[in-house]
Amino acid sequence: MADPHSLASPSDPVGPDGTIVVVGASLAGLRAAEELRHERHGGPVIVVGDEPHAPYDRPPLSKQLLAGTWDEERVHHHAPDKLDTLGIEFRLGLRADSLDVSGRQVHLADGSSLDFDGLIIATGARARRLPGTDGVDGVFVLRTLDDCLALRSRLDQFGDAAGGDAARVVVIGAGFIGAEVAATCHGRGARVTVVEALETPLANVLGVEMGAACAGLHADNGVELRTGAGVAGIDAGADDPVTVTLTDGTVLPADVVVVGIGVTPATDWLEGSGLTVSDGVVCNESLFAAPRIVAAGDVARWWHRGLDQELRIEHWTNATESGPRAARNLLAGSAAATAYEPVPFFWSDQYGVKIQMVGRPDPSDDVVVVDGSVEERRLIALYRRGDRLSAALAFSRPRQLMGYRPLVEAGASFDDALALARS
């Protein structure tokens, strides 16, 4: 199928001295800005970020930093003195308020504006919150560095189960972030309950069989998992800091509640800009949203030519790959731009098990475990769609998984994948 989001008019290359503004100072924005300098762009590069912190890595927030095994400095991508050598101007703690596409201006929350010759939108996503929970003491989300530090500080007020003063933690949502938070809180000695609306966690991503395998990790480690129940309300308790009431009538007392029900693309500042926004900034196959404007990372919804579908991917690898590609395409112009066709890859660390996937399975795909077993929590599972290999999943088999990555990238037959498994 042809790209349904092709530009109405071409995007000329940005000149060597043109000003490029990057809105978003997380991983995709940082990698885009670095790539501009790597490509020897000589004009001003200005990165605007709404958080006050220098660019940092998000995966450790739900693991090492929350656990307390890392300090804050370890999550930053560069030491402060290294940032000064990049030749990039960072304007941090400053939100973009609006975009004037025709005038090529970004309007900022302090009343100032930035003129640009090229714009890279990398504003990422924001954690979804449950209605009515703003301001309820003890209720947290985990998306930003400040979110993590606030949650860790709360957990630091408690001991562990052995001492009898363990925190009672309720995690709402058994997706990858929720599961990682549950595992980390359990590792800190908390008594953890996970609440998931689906009957099988992650069934919409991994299918029922492998979703059930992920659910089993909670049971293996003594973490209570309640599935098939939504949240009816979260309130400040009379005798407990927080009470969580489920749709089945169950009431869960808690000291800490972590809401992990996904994210929404940070596109509110683009309202009225004229860009097409629909669960992200809608882009063509080479990440152009409009002439001289590209998007990257969690906020970009683009046409994946190889998979013949729109994608918006929230994983770390996509941020590291899409940021540089968007930067190169912006410099080259739309006529010389290269389609962005990554093979999706993600990982998650839970209870000492490393879960990795390459490809993009459909829940209806057939799944065959070709190495290890679900019971031992060490396995390779292959996903079949028709006669093709659509994805491969590993539990604590990182080296073996990499052998299947070229097959997934090539759209190999399932028989070829089985042949590799037997070799």
What is each stretch, according to the model?
Residues 4, 8-10, 15-19, 25, ...:
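Mid-to-C-terminal Rossmann-like scaffold of FAD/NAD(P)H-dependent oxidoreductases
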Residues 3-89, 182-205:
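Beta1-alpha1 glycine-rich phosphate/pyrophosphate-binding loop at the start
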Residues 150-206, 210:
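Rossmann-like NAD(P)H-binding beta-loop-alpha module
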Residues 2, 137-162, 240-245, 250-325:
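FAD-site-proximal beta/loop scaffold in flavoenzymes
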Residues 42-44, 84, 90-107, 114, ...:
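A Rossmann-like FAD-binding core segment of flavoenzymes
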Residues 1-21, 76-168, 245-247, 256-260, ...:
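FAD-binding core/adjacent interface of flavoenzyme oxidoreductases
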Residues 26-30, 52, 125-127, 146, ...:
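Residue-level detector of alpha-helix initiation sites
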Residues 17-19, 242, 248-276, 351-423:
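C-terminal catalytic lobe of FAD-dependent flavoproteins
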